From Swiss-Prot:
Subcellular location: Cytoplasm
Protein name per UniProt: Glutamate-1-semialdehyde 2,1-aminomutase
InterPro entries: 4pyrrol_synth_GluAld_NH2Trfase, Aminotrans_3, Aminotrans_3_PPA_site, PyrdxlP-dep_Trfase, PyrdxlP-dep_Trfase_major, PyrdxlP-dep_Trfase_small
Pfam families: Aminotran_3 (PF00202)
CDD domains found in the cross-reference section: OAT_like (cd00610)
Lineage of the species this protein comes from: Bacteria, Thermotogati, Deinococcota, Deinococci, Thermales
PROSITE patterns assigned to the protein according to its UniProt record, in alphabetical order: AA_TRANSFER_CLASS_3 (PS00600)
Family statement drawn from the similarity comment of this UniProt entry: Belongs to the class-III pyridoxal-phosphate-dependent aminotransferase family. HemL subfamily.
Subunit field text: Homodimer.
Keywords assigned by UniProt, alphabetized: Cytoplasm, Isomerase, Porphyrin biosynthesis, Pyridoxal phosphate
Species this protein is from: Thermus thermophilus (strain ATCC BAA-163 / DSM 7039 / HB27)
Stretches of the chain forming a coiled coil according to its record: none
Amino acid sequence: MEGMERPISEAYFQEAKRHIPGGVSSPVRAFKAVGGTPPFLVRGEGAYVWDADGNRYLDYVMSWGPLILGHAHPKVLARVRETLERGLTFGAPSPLEVALAKKVKRAYPFVDLVRFVNSGTEATMSALRLARGYTNRPYIVKFRGNYHGHADGLLVEAGSGALTLGVPSSAGVPEEYAKLTLVLEYNDPEGLREVLRRRGEEIAAIIFEPVVGNAGVLVPTEDFLKALHEAREFGVLLIADEVMTGFRLAFGGATELLGLKPDLVTLGKVLGGGLPAAAYAGRREIMEKVAPLGPVYQAGTLSGNPLAMAAGLATLELLEENPGYYRYLEDLGARLERGLKEVLAQKGIPHAVNRVGSMVTVFFTEGPVVTFQDAKRTDTELFKRFFHGLLDRGIYWPPSNFEAAFLSVAHTEEDVEKTLEALGEAL
Protein backbone atom coordinates (compact mmCIF):
# COMPACT_ATOMS: atom_id res chain seq x y z
CA MET A 1 0.00 0.00 0.00
CA GLU A 2 3.09 2.25 0.09
CA GLY A 3 2.91 5.40 -2.01
CA MET A 4 -0.86 5.62 -2.39
CA GLU A 5 -1.93 7.79 -5.30
CA ARG A 6 -4.72 10.31 -4.79
CA PRO A 7 -5.33 12.11 -8.10
CA ILE A 8 -9.09 12.41 -7.55
CA SER A 9 -8.57 13.84 -4.06
CA GLU A 10 -6.01 16.25 -5.52
CA ALA A 11 -8.51 17.41 -8.14
CA TYR A 12 -11.20 17.87 -5.48
CA PHE A 13 -8.76 19.80 -3.30
CA GLN A 14 -7.85 22.20 -6.10
CA GLU A 15 -11.53 22.73 -6.89
CA ALA A 16 -12.41 23.16 -3.22
CA LYS A 17 -9.82 25.91 -2.85
CA ARG A 18 -11.65 27.91 -5.50
CA HIS A 19 -14.86 27.86 -3.49
CA ILE A 20 -13.94 27.35 0.20
CA PRO A 21 -11.20 29.21 2.16
CA GLY A 22 -8.18 26.91 2.06
CA GLY A 23 -10.37 24.21 0.56
CA VAL A 24 -11.62 23.07 3.95
CA SER A 25 -14.29 23.83 6.54
CA SER A 26 -11.87 23.52 9.49
CA PRO A 27 -8.18 24.53 9.21
CA VAL A 28 -6.36 21.40 10.40
CA ARG A 29 -7.97 19.39 7.58
CA ALA A 30 -5.91 21.30 4.99
CA PHE A 31 -2.69 19.45 5.98
CA LYS A 32 -0.87 22.77 6.43
CA ALA A 33 1.16 21.32 9.30
CA VAL A 34 2.30 18.27 7.34
CA GLY A 35 2.05 19.28 3.68
CA GLY A 36 0.50 17.35 0.85
CA THR A 37 -3.06 16.68 -0.24
CA PRO A 38 -5.71 15.56 2.23
CA PRO A 39 -7.65 12.48 1.16
CA PHE A 40 -11.24 13.41 0.34
CA LEU A 41 -13.20 10.77 2.25
CA VAL A 42 -16.39 9.27 0.89
CA ARG A 43 -17.14 6.27 3.11
CA GLY A 44 -16.47 4.85 6.55
CA GLU A 45 -17.12 1.50 8.16
CA GLY A 46 -15.85 0.29 11.52
CA ALA A 47 -12.25 1.43 11.96
CA TYR A 48 -11.72 2.18 8.26
CA VAL A 49 -12.38 5.00 5.79
CA TRP A 50 -12.16 5.17 2.00
CA ASP A 51 -11.18 8.15 -0.13
CA ALA A 52 -12.50 9.26 -3.50
CA ASP A 53 -9.67 7.34 -5.20
CA GLY A 54 -10.75 4.07 -3.59
CA ASN A 55 -7.84 3.91 -1.12
CA ARG A 56 -8.65 2.37 2.25
CA TYR A 57 -7.20 3.74 5.50
CA LEU A 58 -7.15 2.53 9.08
CA ASP A 59 -8.56 5.60 10.82
CA TYR A 60 -7.12 7.11 14.01
CA VAL A 61 -8.81 10.48 13.45
CA MET A 62 -12.34 9.13 13.89
CA SER A 63 -13.85 12.49 12.91
CA TRP A 64 -11.69 14.08 15.65
CA GLY A 65 -13.22 12.03 18.44
CA PRO A 66 -16.98 11.52 18.12
CA LEU A 67 -16.91 7.99 16.68
CA ILE A 68 -16.07 5.92 19.74
CA LEU A 69 -18.17 3.06 18.29
CA GLY A 70 -16.48 3.30 14.90
CA HIS A 71 -17.87 4.48 11.58
CA ALA A 72 -21.45 3.70 10.56
CA HIS A 73 -22.40 1.61 13.60
CA PRO A 74 -25.56 -0.26 12.51
CA LYS A 75 -27.57 0.54 15.65
CA VAL A 76 -26.77 4.24 15.40
CA LEU A 77 -27.65 4.31 11.70
CA ALA A 78 -30.91 2.46 12.34
CA ARG A 79 -31.96 4.97 15.02
CA VAL A 80 -31.13 7.90 12.74
CA ARG A 81 -33.03 6.37 9.80
CA GLU A 82 -36.06 5.73 11.99
CA THR A 83 -36.01 9.34 13.18
CA LEU A 84 -35.34 10.70 9.70
CA GLU A 85 -38.56 9.19 8.38
CA ARG A 86 -40.52 11.34 10.85
CA GLY A 87 -38.94 14.65 9.86
CA LEU A 88 -35.59 16.42 9.92
CA THR A 89 -36.17 19.15 12.49
CA PHE A 90 -39.08 20.91 14.16
CA GLY A 91 -37.68 23.83 16.13
CA ALA A 92 -39.74 22.56 19.06
CA PRO A 93 -39.18 20.34 22.11
CA SER A 94 -38.94 16.63 21.37
CA PRO A 95 -39.00 13.45 23.47
CA LEU A 96 -35.52 12.54 22.22
CA GLU A 97 -33.85 15.53 23.86
CA VAL A 98 -35.51 14.68 27.17
CA ALA A 99 -34.22 11.11 26.91
CA LEU A 100 -30.70 12.27 26.06
CA ALA A 101 -30.69 14.81 28.92
CA LYS A 102 -31.62 12.02 31.35
CA LYS A 103 -28.76 9.92 29.97
CA VAL A 104 -26.31 12.79 30.52
CA LYS A 105 -27.49 13.13 34.12
CA ARG A 106 -26.91 9.42 34.74
CA ALA A 107 -23.36 9.77 33.46
CA TYR A 108 -22.68 12.98 35.42
CA PRO A 109 -24.41 12.70 38.83
CA PHE A 110 -23.67 16.31 39.85
CA VAL A 111 -25.70 17.58 36.87
CA ASP A 112 -29.28 18.74 37.49
CA LEU A 113 -30.08 20.47 34.19
CA VAL A 114 -28.78 20.11 30.63
CA ARG A 115 -29.01 22.59 27.72
CA PHE A 116 -28.31 21.28 24.20
CA VAL A 117 -26.50 23.29 21.53
CA ASN A 118 -24.89 22.40 18.20
CA SER A 119 -21.13 22.63 18.73
CA GLY A 120 -18.45 22.58 21.37
CA THR A 121 -17.78 26.25 20.74
CA GLU A 122 -21.42 27.08 21.49
CA ALA A 123 -21.25 24.99 24.65
CA THR A 124 -18.15 26.64 26.09
CA MET A 125 -19.19 30.13 24.99
CA SER A 126 -22.59 29.69 26.65
CA ALA A 127 -21.11 28.18 29.81
CA LEU A 128 -18.82 31.18 30.24
CA ARG A 129 -21.66 33.64 29.69
CA LEU A 130 -23.64 31.72 32.28
CA ALA A 131 -20.74 31.76 34.75
CA ARG A 132 -20.38 35.52 34.39
CA GLY A 133 -24.13 36.00 34.72
CA TYR A 134 -24.30 33.83 37.82
CA THR A 135 -21.31 35.38 39.62
CA ASN A 136 -21.51 38.96 38.28
CA ARG A 137 -17.75 38.80 37.77
CA PRO A 138 -15.89 39.67 34.54
CA TYR A 139 -12.76 37.50 34.39
CA ILE A 140 -12.20 33.97 33.12
CA VAL A 141 -9.12 31.79 33.65
CA LYS A 142 -7.94 29.38 30.97
CA PHE A 143 -4.70 27.49 30.43
CA ARG A 144 -2.12 27.68 27.66
CA GLY A 145 -2.67 25.01 25.04
CA ASN A 146 -6.20 24.21 26.21
CA TYR A 147 -8.62 24.65 23.33
CA HIS A 148 -12.24 25.53 24.04
CA GLY A 149 -13.52 26.40 20.58
CA HIS A 150 -13.21 29.57 18.55
CA ALA A 151 -15.29 32.08 20.52
CA ASP A 152 -13.45 35.40 20.86
CA GLY A 153 -12.90 35.21 24.59
CA LEU A 154 -11.39 31.74 24.35
CA LEU A 155 -9.20 32.02 21.27
CA VAL A 156 -6.41 33.38 23.43
CA GLU A 157 -3.23 31.28 23.54
CA ALA A 158 -5.30 28.33 22.39
CA GLY A 159 -4.22 24.89 21.28
CA SER A 160 -5.63 22.78 18.44
CA GLY A 161 -5.74 24.36 14.98
CA ALA A 162 -4.53 27.70 16.32
CA LEU A 163 -1.37 26.04 17.61
CA THR A 164 -0.90 24.03 14.43
CA LEU A 165 -1.01 27.22 12.36
CA GLY A 166 1.56 28.88 14.59
CA VAL A 167 -0.75 31.60 15.88
CA PRO A 168 -1.38 31.72 19.64
CA SER A 169 -4.64 33.63 19.15
CA SER A 170 -6.46 35.14 16.18
CA ALA A 171 -6.82 38.35 14.27
CA GLY A 172 -10.24 39.86 14.83
CA VAL A 173 -10.26 39.29 18.59
CA PRO A 174 -10.41 42.74 20.26
CA GLU A 175 -7.56 43.23 22.71
CA GLU A 176 -9.97 44.69 25.26
CA TYR A 177 -12.06 41.52 25.18
CA ALA A 178 -9.05 39.22 25.31
CA LYS A 179 -7.89 41.00 28.48
CA LEU A 180 -10.87 39.50 30.31
CA THR A 181 -9.29 36.06 29.85
CA LEU A 182 -6.40 35.35 32.23
CA VAL A 183 -4.09 32.76 30.67
CA LEU A 184 -2.07 30.53 33.00
CA GLU A 185 0.23 27.53 32.56
CA TYR A 186 -1.45 24.12 32.58
CA ASN A 187 -0.13 21.88 35.37
CA ASP A 188 1.26 24.85 37.32
CA PRO A 189 -0.66 24.65 40.61
CA GLU A 190 1.33 27.37 42.37
CA GLY A 191 0.78 29.80 39.50
CA LEU A 192 -2.96 29.16 39.75
CA ARG A 193 -2.96 29.59 43.53
CA GLU A 194 -1.10 32.90 43.21
CA VAL A 195 -3.65 34.30 40.73
CA LEU A 196 -6.50 33.16 42.96
CA ARG A 197 -4.93 34.90 45.96
CA ARG A 198 -4.47 38.14 44.01
CA ARG A 199 -7.61 38.23 41.87
CA GLY A 200 -9.90 35.43 43.00
CA GLU A 201 -12.83 37.72 43.82
CA GLU A 202 -12.86 39.09 40.24
CA ILE A 203 -12.84 35.68 38.54
CA ALA A 204 -16.13 34.16 37.41
CA ALA A 205 -14.82 30.76 36.34
CA ILE A 206 -11.88 28.57 35.47
CA ILE A 207 -12.37 26.60 32.27
CA PHE A 208 -10.06 23.66 31.66
CA GLU A 209 -9.63 20.44 29.72
CA PRO A 210 -9.40 17.75 32.44
CA VAL A 211 -7.23 15.75 30.06
CA VAL A 212 -5.84 18.00 27.33
CA GLY A 213 -6.28 16.71 23.80
CA ASN A 214 -5.74 19.85 21.77
CA ALA A 215 -2.04 20.41 22.45
CA GLY A 216 -1.55 16.71 22.08
CA VAL A 217 -2.53 14.63 25.10
CA LEU A 218 -1.45 16.18 28.42
CA VAL A 219 -2.34 14.58 31.75
CA PRO A 220 -3.10 16.68 34.86
CA THR A 221 -1.03 16.27 38.01
CA GLU A 222 -2.75 15.58 41.33
CA ASP A 223 -1.62 18.89 42.80
CA PHE A 224 -2.96 20.79 39.79
CA LEU A 225 -6.38 19.16 40.22
CA LYS A 226 -6.25 20.01 43.92
CA ALA A 227 -5.48 23.65 43.13
CA LEU A 228 -8.42 23.78 40.72
CA HIS A 229 -10.82 22.67 43.43
CA GLU A 230 -9.36 25.23 45.86
CA ALA A 231 -10.80 27.92 43.58
CA ARG A 232 -14.17 27.36 45.27
CA GLU A 233 -12.83 29.10 48.36
CA PHE A 234 -12.96 32.30 46.27
CA GLY A 235 -16.43 31.69 44.82
CA VAL A 236 -14.94 30.77 41.43
CA LEU A 237 -16.88 28.27 39.31
CA LEU A 238 -15.12 25.28 37.73
CA ILE A 239 -16.04 24.47 34.13
CA ALA A 240 -14.76 21.09 32.95
CA ASP A 241 -14.53 21.19 29.16
CA GLU A 242 -15.29 17.57 28.32
CA VAL A 243 -16.20 18.15 24.69
CA MET A 244 -13.42 15.71 23.79
CA THR A 245 -13.20 13.50 26.88
CA GLY A 246 -16.91 13.20 27.74
CA PHE A 247 -18.18 9.62 27.36
CA ARG A 248 -14.78 8.69 25.88
CA LEU A 249 -12.48 8.12 28.86
CA ALA A 250 -15.34 6.64 30.90
CA PHE A 251 -19.11 6.83 30.67
CA GLY A 252 -18.83 9.82 33.00
CA GLY A 253 -15.80 11.10 31.11
CA ALA A 254 -12.69 12.53 32.73
CA THR A 255 -14.88 13.81 35.57
CA GLU A 256 -15.53 10.21 36.60
CA LEU A 257 -12.03 8.97 35.79
CA LEU A 258 -10.26 11.67 37.81
CA GLY A 259 -12.86 12.15 40.56
CA LEU A 260 -13.55 15.79 39.67
CA LYS A 261 -16.35 17.94 41.05
CA PRO A 262 -16.96 20.79 38.59
CA ASP A 263 -19.88 23.21 38.73
CA LEU A 264 -20.49 23.04 34.98
CA VAL A 265 -19.45 20.62 32.26
CA THR A 266 -19.40 21.09 28.50
CA LEU A 267 -19.97 18.09 26.25
CA GLY A 268 -19.87 17.36 22.53
CA LYS A 269 -18.30 14.94 20.03
CA VAL A 270 -19.37 11.51 21.42
CA LEU A 271 -22.56 13.13 22.74
CA GLY A 272 -23.81 13.56 19.16
CA GLY A 273 -22.80 10.12 17.96
CA GLY A 274 -21.32 11.60 14.78
CA LEU A 275 -23.89 14.36 14.22
CA PRO A 276 -23.60 17.99 15.41
CA ALA A 277 -24.63 18.11 19.06
CA ALA A 278 -23.15 19.55 22.22
CA ALA A 279 -24.35 20.62 25.65
CA TYR A 280 -23.53 22.54 28.77
CA ALA A 281 -24.84 21.20 32.05
CA GLY A 282 -24.53 21.67 35.77
CA ARG A 283 -26.03 22.45 39.13
CA ARG A 284 -29.64 23.65 39.25
CA GLU A 285 -29.01 27.01 40.91
CA ILE A 286 -26.56 27.92 38.13
CA MET A 287 -28.46 26.47 35.17
CA GLU A 288 -31.69 28.17 36.24
CA LYS A 289 -30.05 31.47 35.30
CA VAL A 290 -30.42 30.45 31.62
CA ALA A 291 -33.37 31.79 29.62
CA PRO A 292 -36.31 31.25 29.77
CA LEU A 293 -35.87 30.75 33.53
CA GLY A 294 -33.27 33.45 34.04
CA PRO A 295 -31.55 36.49 32.53
CA VAL A 296 -28.68 34.73 30.69
CA TYR A 297 -29.70 34.46 27.04
CA GLN A 298 -28.80 31.58 24.74
CA ALA A 299 -30.76 30.09 21.84
CA GLY A 300 -30.35 28.07 18.64
CA THR A 301 -32.52 27.15 15.66
CA LEU A 302 -31.24 23.58 15.42
CA SER A 303 -30.38 22.99 19.08
CA GLY A 304 -31.72 19.63 20.22
CA ASN A 305 -32.60 18.62 16.66
CA PRO A 306 -34.05 15.09 16.48
CA LEU A 307 -31.42 13.51 14.22
CA ALA A 308 -28.50 14.49 16.45
CA MET A 309 -30.44 13.53 19.58
CA ALA A 310 -31.21 10.12 18.05
CA ALA A 311 -27.59 9.45 17.10
CA GLY A 312 -26.39 10.57 20.51
CA LEU A 313 -28.98 8.55 22.39
CA ALA A 314 -28.18 5.38 20.45
CA THR A 315 -24.46 5.88 21.10
CA LEU A 316 -24.83 6.51 24.83
CA GLU A 317 -27.21 3.57 25.21
CA LEU A 318 -24.62 1.25 23.69
CA LEU A 319 -21.87 2.66 25.91
CA GLU A 320 -23.98 2.33 29.06
CA GLU A 321 -25.12 -1.19 28.17
CA ASN A 322 -21.56 -2.33 27.43
CA PRO A 323 -19.28 -1.05 30.21
CA GLY A 324 -16.65 -3.52 29.03
CA TYR A 325 -16.02 -1.23 26.06
CA TYR A 326 -13.94 1.06 28.27
CA ARG A 327 -11.81 -1.82 29.55
CA TYR A 328 -11.31 -2.92 25.95
CA LEU A 329 -10.25 0.57 24.87
CA GLU A 330 -7.85 0.86 27.81
CA ASP A 331 -6.21 -2.48 26.98
CA LEU A 332 -5.99 -1.68 23.27
CA GLY A 333 -4.63 1.79 24.02
CA ALA A 334 -2.01 0.32 26.33
CA ARG A 335 -0.89 -2.08 23.57
CA LEU A 336 -0.64 0.79 21.08
CA GLU A 337 1.30 2.94 23.55
CA ARG A 338 3.70 0.13 24.39
CA GLY A 339 4.25 -0.70 20.73
CA LEU A 340 4.86 2.90 19.71
CA LYS A 341 7.49 3.26 22.43
CA GLU A 342 9.18 0.01 21.37
CA VAL A 343 9.38 0.94 17.68
CA LEU A 344 10.64 4.46 18.35
CA ALA A 345 13.21 3.22 20.87
CA GLN A 346 14.48 0.64 18.36
CA LYS A 347 14.93 3.44 15.83
CA GLY A 348 16.76 5.60 18.37
CA ILE A 349 14.22 8.40 18.03
CA PRO A 350 13.63 10.69 21.04
CA HIS A 351 9.98 10.41 21.99
CA ALA A 352 7.30 10.68 24.63
CA VAL A 353 4.02 8.82 24.19
CA ASN A 354 1.19 10.34 26.22
CA ARG A 355 -2.02 8.36 26.53
CA VAL A 356 -5.20 8.25 28.57
CA GLY A 357 -7.60 5.48 27.60
CA SER A 358 -8.35 5.70 23.89
CA MET A 359 -6.55 9.04 23.34
CA VAL A 360 -2.84 9.05 22.43
CA THR A 361 -0.18 11.46 21.16
CA VAL A 362 3.41 10.81 20.08
CA PHE A 363 5.72 13.73 20.85
CA PHE A 364 9.13 13.69 19.18
CA THR A 365 11.12 15.02 22.11
CA GLU A 366 12.67 13.66 25.28
CA GLY A 367 9.99 13.20 27.90
CA PRO A 368 8.21 13.73 30.08
CA VAL A 369 5.72 16.03 28.34
CA VAL A 370 3.57 17.54 31.08
CA THR A 371 3.04 21.17 30.10
CA PHE A 372 2.23 23.14 26.98
CA GLN A 373 5.85 24.31 26.85
CA ASP A 374 7.01 20.68 26.91
CA ALA A 375 4.67 19.84 24.04
CA LYS A 376 6.04 22.66 21.88
CA ARG A 377 9.51 21.05 22.00
CA THR A 378 8.32 18.27 19.68
CA ASP A 379 10.19 17.89 16.38
CA THR A 380 7.46 18.80 13.91
CA GLU A 381 9.67 17.96 10.91
CA LEU A 382 10.08 14.43 12.21
CA PHE A 383 6.33 14.29 12.78
CA LYS A 384 5.79 15.03 9.08
CA ARG A 385 7.85 11.93 8.22
CA PHE A 386 5.91 9.91 10.78
CA PHE A 387 2.57 11.11 9.42
CA HIS A 388 3.25 10.63 5.72
CA GLY A 389 5.02 7.34 6.30
CA LEU A 390 1.86 6.03 7.93
CA LEU A 391 -0.53 7.64 5.44
CA ASP A 392 1.32 6.09 2.49
CA ARG A 393 0.86 2.72 4.18
CA GLY A 394 -2.86 3.14 4.72
CA ILE A 395 -2.81 4.50 8.29
CA TYR A 396 -4.69 7.79 8.76
CA TRP A 397 -3.18 9.51 11.81
CA PRO A 398 -4.23 13.07 12.77
CA PRO A 399 -2.37 15.54 10.50
CA SER A 400 -0.98 17.60 13.38
CA ASN A 401 1.44 16.77 16.18
CA PHE A 402 -0.79 18.77 18.51
CA GLU A 403 -3.89 16.60 18.26
CA ALA A 404 -4.91 13.35 19.91
CA ALA A 405 -5.28 10.15 17.94
CA PHE A 406 -8.40 8.16 18.80
CA LEU A 407 -9.21 4.49 19.10
CA SER A 408 -12.72 3.10 18.78
CA VAL A 409 -14.30 -0.17 19.85
CA ALA A 410 -14.16 -1.12 16.16
CA HIS A 411 -10.34 -1.14 16.25
CA THR A 412 -8.72 -4.52 16.87
CA GLU A 413 -5.39 -5.87 18.09
CA GLU A 414 -4.68 -6.77 14.48
CA ASP A 415 -5.21 -3.11 13.54
CA VAL A 416 -2.72 -2.02 16.18
CA GLU A 417 -0.13 -4.57 15.00
CA LYS A 418 -0.65 -3.36 11.44
CA THR A 419 -0.02 0.21 12.60
CA LEU A 420 3.19 -0.70 14.41
CA GLU A 421 4.47 -2.67 11.43
CA ALA A 422 3.76 0.29 9.15
CA LEU A 423 5.56 2.63 11.54
CA GLY A 424 8.60 0.37 11.58
CA GLU A 425 8.75 0.52 7.79
CA ALA A 426 8.03 4.25 7.62
CA LEU A 427 10.89 5.27 9.94
